[in-house]
Amino acid sequence: MKRTKKINHSSFRKSWSARHLTPVALAVTAVFMLAGCEKSDETVSLYQNADDCSAANPGKAAECTTAYTNAVKEAERTAPKYATREDCVAEFGEGQCQQTPAQAGVAPENQAQAQSSGSFWMPLMAGYMMGRLMGGGMAQQQPLFSSKNPASPAYGQYTDASGKSYGAAQPGRTMNVPKTAMAPKPATTTTVTRGGFGESVAKQSTMQRSAAGSTSSSRSMGG
């Protein structure tokens, strides 16, 4: 009877480990790469108007005015729209809403809602985020909204058109945000029901807290 060749268990274990751990290593690497991509990678400043920007950036008054003007135009294009003043005020508070012409691209059923006045209602732009003014390039900007109704999830917060919050509505702050935060938002093509924007803010806040918790857990596991 032939003797069975002696198995090199050490070599076997190494081979098995390398073969089976490689995918895990790749997965871990992918996670860290994704985490790196999601890190805050752009510094922005929060201003209420062009004067605030000019005061913080001496000699850049023209650029500040242009950025503010562009932010206002972007707000008109992307802000939540309401069929009635009452719906907007219920969300953002008294004195925080303005009429805006019914724009092209709005769904026909929503256009019909505004036929009597020829316009919708939208929140006033409370401030805007602006990227750094560097060289001769024009800085990006993103309009921000805020509610003065204590019952709204957006109360006292700076939020963009998607409902994502950027903290307390206090101009003059500088913060780091993902580059995606400065990307243009889609134009508003439907009206929002009363309380609808607040729901979006609440959902976004929940997602942000969940993401922050996951990041914290990952760091804890990593030691």
UniProtKB/Swiss-Prot annotation:
Pfam families recorded: DUF1190 (PF06693)
Compositionally biased tracts (Low complexity): 177-193, 209-223
Segments of this protein annotated with the region Disordered: 165-223
Cross-referenced InterPro entries: Biofilm_formation_YgiB (IPR009576)
The family this protein is said to belong to: Belongs to the UPF0441 family.
HAMAP family: UPF0441 (MF_01188)
Descriptive protein name: UPF0441 protein KPK_0672
